């Protein structure tokens, strides 16, 4: 009897262990399948929609037919875009020598011409500017042995004191690295082609000094940023060689939109802030008591701020897309219900993107709120009963935990449905990081944060970063620079 009881206990333990192993195997298989999808599958997060789940077959058929009809009428043969008219033109005439008729020998007359344009590239031109300052002295004082006075014009203020770099050269270095992701060792090789020896150490020193000059302008932009009613924030890792931490972080904060919009009262600003940690203190100290709306992902550090947090439906949707990938091809299930509803929310946003703030608020209250109610019902009814697909459980838990932040965007027409604005602002830094890989020192990372801020803010305000940085450097090296005139929306080209 005793042995039988012990045997049953042993069987129960083994069954429990087997269930744990099965769960681990299932989780590993899900991770492997998702990794395969990410590496070899489509990278887009598209979702065709599952209208039949909501008895909307007729609506979908009408949409498809309308789309097909639109395509059949609007499809055009690709046409090459004309070259800009403001580019200088150089004419090359290809004429015949013999202008007599091969048939009768008569003189040919000109009846027209064919013209085609080819785009020529002229390599960068580098020159040396010699600053000559004549010296003047008084001959009378020389002869009378009195004190000789020498007069000479003072040197104009330069970004790099006693250095050879002009504003244009510094702007070239900065835009090459921070706009186009060109590491300094490649720029060093490019200058060698012109017979100019510029070491990486020298260029790095110039970039650090330029970043110091830009610091007052970045502080002015930050003050302007923190005055806005709505902000976006995100962060991404950065390796710093001479640091005790494995990963440091570049935080990004932005306002406005990705491009100039005269109808948008909120200025377009992107600012980067480097820290050697991802602690909540980083964002708390930077925002300095900011109490407006802050669009974020689910990272808990943002909850320590005084801002009203707005959740990101793109993050929520992405988690359900991962669950959809594990569901298998041509299969439908609970994940499709959620994705279809989220797709409808984005459909509303697509239709109202050019509307006024009041119109956006009205549309969201009338159309988006009922969709959110359906999502809430799904959460309450289905989330407790989810089994199997761990990614679906993870996505549902994220949706439930972030729900109060995710639904806030419908309460104000100034708010966005997601945090894609910040994610797009992070992308140029991520692309650049793939080229130069890391920062050597924390000081270098701080300089990068400053210069990325300047380059990206110039871009989203429709400015050419090279020209803007040149003008800024010329002004910022003055004894009393006019900072307000350098704000992108005040800048005169």
Annotate each PLM feature.
Residues 135-493:
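Catalytic center-proximal scaffold of phosphoryl-transfer enzymes
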Residues 1-164, 203-204, 232-233, 260-268, ...:
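Short, flexible loop/hinge motifs at secondary-structure junctions
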């Amino acid at each position: 009897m005793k042995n039988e009881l012990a045997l049953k206990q042993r069987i129960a333990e083994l069954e429990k262990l087997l269930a744990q192993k099965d769960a681990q195997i299932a989780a590993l298989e899900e991770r492997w399948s998702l990794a395969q999808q990410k590496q070899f599958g489509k990278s887009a997060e598209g979702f065709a929609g599952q209208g039949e789940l909501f008895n909307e077959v007729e609506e979908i058929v009408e949409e498809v037919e309308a789309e097909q009809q639109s395509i059949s009428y609007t499809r055009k043969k690709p046409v090459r875009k004309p070259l800009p008219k403001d580019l200088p033109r150089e004419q090359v005439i290809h004429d015949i020598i013999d202008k007599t008729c091969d048939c009768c020998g008569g003189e040919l007359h000109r009846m027209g011409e064919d013209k085609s344009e080819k785009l020529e590239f002229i390599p960068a031109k580098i020159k040396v500017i010699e600053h000559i300052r004549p010296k003047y002295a008084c001959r009378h004082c020389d002869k009378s042995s009195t004190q000789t006075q020498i007069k000479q014009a003072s040197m104009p203020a330069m970004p790099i004191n006693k250095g050879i770099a002009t504003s244009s050269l510094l702007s070239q270095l900065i835009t090459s690295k921070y706009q186009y992701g060109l590491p300094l060792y490649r720029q060093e090789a490019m200058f060698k082609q012109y017979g100019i020896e510029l070491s990486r150490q020298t260029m790095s020193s110039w970039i650090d000094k330029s970043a110091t000059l830009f610091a007052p302008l970045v502080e002015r932009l930050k003050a302007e940023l923190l005055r806005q009613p709505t902000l976006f924030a995100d962060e991404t890792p950065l390796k710093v060689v001479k640091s005790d931490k494995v990963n440091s972080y570049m935080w990004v904060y932005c306002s406005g939109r990705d491009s100039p919009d005269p109808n948008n009262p909120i200025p377009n600003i992107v600012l980067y802030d480097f820290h050697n940690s991802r602690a909540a203190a980083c964002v708390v100290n930077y925002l300095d008591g900011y109490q407006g709306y802050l669009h974020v992902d689910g990272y808990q550090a943002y909850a320590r701020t005084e801002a009203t947090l707005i959740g990101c439906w793109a993050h929520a949707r992405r988690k359900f897309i991962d669950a959809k990938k594990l569901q298998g091809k041509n299969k439908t299930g609970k994940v499709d219900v959620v994705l279809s509803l989220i797709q409808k929310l984005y459909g509303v946003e697509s239709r109202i993107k050019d509307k006024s703030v009041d119109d956006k608020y009205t549309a969201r209250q009338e159309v988006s709120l009922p969709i959110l109610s359906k999502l809430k019902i799904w959460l309450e009814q289905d989330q407790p009963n989810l089994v199997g697909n761990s990614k679906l459980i993870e996505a549902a838990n994220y949706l439930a935990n972030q729900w109060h932040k995710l639904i806030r965007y419908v309460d104000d027409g100034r708010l966005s449905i997601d945090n894609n604005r910040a994610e797009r602002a992070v992308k140029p830094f991520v692309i650049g990081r793939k080229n130069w890989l890391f920062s050597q020192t924390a000081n270098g990372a701080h300089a990068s944060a400053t210069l990325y801020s300047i380059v990206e803010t110039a871009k989203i305000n429709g400015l050419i970063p090279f020209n803007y940085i040149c003008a800024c450097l010329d002004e910022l090296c003055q004894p009393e620079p006019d900072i307000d005139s350098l704000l992108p929306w005040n800048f005169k080209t």
